[in-house]
Amino acid sequence: MFRFDIFCVLLLLTQVGCNKSSGIVEYEVDRESDKVLTTDLLREQFDPIPFRWKVPAEWTEGENDQFSAIAWTVGSKSDPARITVSGLSAASGLEAQIVRWRGQLQLPEMAVTEVMNSVEDVTLQGATGKWCEFKNDTESILGMIVPHTDKLWIIKFRGGNATAAKARDAFRGFCESLKIE
């Protein structure tokens, strides 16, 4: 009735395993999120930027975040602005990016067609960019979005209204200097 082969397997299983002399070894490995991401490490995470530009002399290179391929700062310490270049999948949508900027400034919602009417086409060397400007009572976003191959290249200026007013022409000139390589 009782099968001998099952009995042997069960008996064998009771005899196998760790013996008392086997020590348990613990390993600790740092989580990847604990890694400090420097500007150079972050740049390596992005595709190469397909264009060149002329950076205004008053801009200083800033620290990257996980979204920007390169960053600069401009303005005083009391009213700094941040300029970033980021590459996103074209599937993310041009209109969605522009509407998102309005949301970041907590501006009233508008129909997408109405928002897009405020966007200006700018002819660049090798591409056409979309220029837009938004501001609330204290803060401004100036931006250029350049569709190129399968990406949207986002060039964004965000800072206080006073700094934005002073730096607008330099930022616009920077955007217009973009040259596709």
Q: PLM ranges: what are they?
A:
Residues 2, 15-81, 88-90, 99-113, ...:
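N-terminal targeting sequences that direct proteins away from the cytosol to non-cytosolic compartments
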Residues 5-15:
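Bacterial N-terminal signal peptides
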Residues 93:
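Extracellular/lumenal carbohydrate-interaction signature centered on repeated Trp-anchored short motifs
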Residues 130-132:
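Extended beta-strand-rich segments in extracellular/periplasmic secretory proteins, especially
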